[in-house]
Amino acid sequence: MFNVILVAPEIPPNTGNVIRLCANTGARLHLIEPLGFPLDDAKMRRAGLDYHEYAEMRVHRDWDAFVAAEAPDPARMFAFTTRGSGRFHDHAFVPGDWFVFGSETRGLPADVLERFPNEQRVRLPMRPGNRSLNLSNTVAVVVFEAWRQAGFEGGA
């Protein structure tokens, strides 16, 4: 299935929502430290309800530790950013792809973003003049589009 990577998430309910999303879609969740909250944060657990036990979640101390542990295919990694030039719906996603998202207030760190070629820096369309969409909403849009492209494989 797909892989969701949150780099330094800051807001517990957003991460809780993403945990619930991953549990319901079969996506794997990777959290890259530092996290803006402890993993047992009540707000995160409340947002994720009882889905934590159904989600496959891994925590990595930093970007390099994540890459070393998971060995993702660089050609199948996509950085979602308001500074992206590509439109996400122009990509053909396949199971196993890696979707990378930055923190709610800062987005992806420059040292992570610069590792992605321009064609893999993608954005969701939105109205001009707006800063960004909510992190968990963005993740949901991306995961469901990718899953749709895969024919909702494994879904009921």
From Swiss-Prot:
It is found in: Cytoplasm. It comes from the Bacteria. Homodimer. Methylates the ribose at the nucleotide 34 wobble position in the two leucyl isoacceptors tRNA(Leu)(CmAA) and tRNA(Leu)(cmnm5UmAA). Catalyzes the methyl transfer from S-adenosyl-L-methionine to the 2'-OH of the wobble nucleotide. Pfam families: SpoU_methylase. This is tRNA (cytidine(34)-2'-O)-methyltransferase. GO terms for biological process: wobble position cytosine ribose methylation; wobble position uridine ribose methylation. It comes from Burkholderia ambifaria (strain ATCC BAA-244 / DSM 16087 / CCUG 44356 / LMG 19182 / AMMD) (Burkholderia cepacia (strain AMMD)). Keywords: Cytoplasm, Methyltransferase, S-adenosyl-L-methionine, Transferase, tRNA processing.
